[in-house]
Amino acid sequence: MLMFKFFFLLFSFLFSFNSYSYWQQRVEYKISIDFDHKNHQFLGEQNLKYFNNSKDTINKVYFHLYFNAFQPGSMMDVRSRSLPDPDRRVMDRISKLSKNEIGFHQIKKIEQDGKSLIHHTQGTVLEVELAYPLMPNQSTDFYLEYLSQVPVQIRRSGRNSKEGIDYSMAQWFPKIAEYDENGWHANPYIAREFYAPWGDFDVSISINKDYIVAATGILESKKKVNNKNIWNFKAKDVHDFVWAADPDYVHDILKVDSENLELHFYYQKTNDEMVSNWKRLQDDTADAFRYINKKFGKYPYTKYSVIQGGDGGMEYPMATLITGERSYPSLLSVTVHEVLHSWYQMLLGTNESYLAWMDEGFTSFAQNITFNNEFNDIYKLDSKNPLEGSYNRYYNFIKTGLEEPLSTHSDHFSTNQAYGVGSYTKGAIFLMQLGYIIGEEKLYSGLRRYYNEWKFKHPDEYDFLRIMEKETDIELDWYMDYWVKTTHQIDYSLEVFEKDKSTVSININRIGK
């Protein structure tokens, strides 16, 4: 009887441990597109092997069709026109797009292991009913054919940017949604955040021979076929793929041997000042990588590309798209910010729809620390408090009464300002104040431990918190509960009363919640 109880308890423990063990889905993409630059359209063939590493049986899957957001009446369009403080890059521009300016994905065929599938498209989401269930620890193969049109560049992706870049190709293919312990995350696209499974990409782009192509991954081959070149890129262990193309790109390469890294820079020769800035940027980017590798953890890939394109600055695996016609401090600032996103979101793949503060906030914190230590001759931050500007922005925003909890879904903030100040500014202060609580040395050792234990995974806020608690042996749930889940502030006043010449009475009053 005693032996039976022992084995029963052992089995119960193992079952319980297995029930809560970490898992994540995985994908393998093989995409080939034939690009028609005259009509801004491309035909795509996409093979996708999908690995179900969950304990669940899957009967349907979802894909994101991001280009469909750039159509009059889309959710992105309506939301932009409804916000009290719309993004100036978007405003009502989508509502004014003509038929040949909109974006779209038209799914021509989708199969599962050779069997045609029933599918439905609603806005930016494609719902696909499987021919047969996908069981736990099994994989299946999808095949898609589609026609896509590249929209006029409004937000992140598109053609003919304001700086004259022909194609900024972000969120350009039907991308399978993430499935995790909370189920599917097939959120409609309204220009905010992304979340996708880890995997490998093999992408072939057939485009007019005059174009220079920059992309995620390593260029495996470039073959001329008739009047086109076929560019083949491969990337391992990433959760997205970006590319850009322009006939006038200058392509510079800087080898950083100490970091086992090649830095690639793609930009236009718009004017002498711009060329000078982009040349200067190259050594500074190398210095940034050297510092960040030591401070926050080693970058694991052998390539990173800084690409002129898009509408501001946006991070992708092994690359960023940035606008390039900037003053040098602005150019370096946006580059360092996007480089740091390689740590916070590209390698620590949080669900930024729910945890934008762990993406933008952690990046903004690390950006200021990097500036203070490497580039303070340019930015002149307060060395004792490199985030002084963040504290001032947050304090001024609190007074507006518009603050919302950081735990708000990024698509559901009532204003763009609440999202921006919360995610970027309050998120950065989260780490600064955490350092005050646990000590600066423990903060940075904890950040490196967090990176080393959770890179190539999908951590959440509690995974981060547990790392910091292990590193410090301090309970920190209270800090998360108040700083992230509420808008309570630390606010005290002092009242000083002189009772007589030798006695002073001081009252400390708590004003904040």
Q: Model-derived features: where do they sit?
A:
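N-terminal, polar/Ser/Thr-rich
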Residues: F15-L43, E163, L476-W478, I490
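Acidic/His/Gly-enriched intrinsically disordered linker/tail segments
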Residues: Y354, E360-I429, Q433, I437
